[in-house]
C-alpha cells in the first residue's frame, strides 16, 4: 500500500489497471461491466477494419446480469469480433451456480446464434484449443 511504483501509486487495485497503448481498456468493480466495454472495442475494430479481436473474461455471476444478454444480442447482430470467456467456478457470489441457472451456462450463447463451447477451465490446453477454434 502506498508504493510509488504500485498501481495508482499503491492506492488502487486491479480495477484501475489499463494500458490503452496495448489495448488493455481496464477493469472495474461492477459485476459484468467489462463485457459491454469489450463489445465497444470489438465494434471499433470492425469499423476501423483493423482485424483485431476484443476479449472479455468474467465470472459466472455476470451471466445473470442483463448487460451480458444485451451484449450477446448486439454482438450477434453486428457480427462483432468478440470472444467472451466465462470462468465458471460453480459459485455466483453466495449461491451455487446449479441453484441460480436453469440451463448450462455455455448454452446461453446458442439463443443468440453465437458459437459456444464449454471446456474444463482447469485444462489449459483445452481452453487454448477452444479459444483457437472460436476465433478461427
Q: What is each of the regions a protein language model found here?
A:
Residues 82-136:
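Thiamine diphosphate
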Amino acid at each position: 500500500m502506498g508504493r510509488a511504483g504500485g498501481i495508482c501509486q499503491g492506492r488502487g487495485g486491479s480495477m484501475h489497471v489499463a494500458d490503452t497503448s496495448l489495448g488493455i481498456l481496464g477493469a472495474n468493480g461492477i459485476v459484468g461491466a467489462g463485457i459491454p466495454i469489450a463489445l465497444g472495442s470489438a465494434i471499433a475494430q470492425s469499423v476501423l477494419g483493423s482485424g483485431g479481436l476484443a476479449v472479455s473474461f468474467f465470472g459466472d455471476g455476470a451471466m445473470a446480469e442483463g448487460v451480458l444478454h444485451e451484449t450477446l444480442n448486439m454482438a450477434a447482430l453486428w457480427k462483432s469480433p468478440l470472444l467472451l470467456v466465462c470462468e465458471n467456478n460453480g459459485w455466483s457470489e453466495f449461491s451455487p451456480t446449479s441453484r441460480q441457472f436453469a440451463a448450462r451456462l455455455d448454452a446461453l450463447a446458442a439463443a443468440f446464434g453465437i458459437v459456444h463451447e464449454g471446456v474444463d477451465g482447469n485444462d489449459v490446453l483445452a481452453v487454448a484449443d477452444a479459444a483457437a477454434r472460436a476465433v478461427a
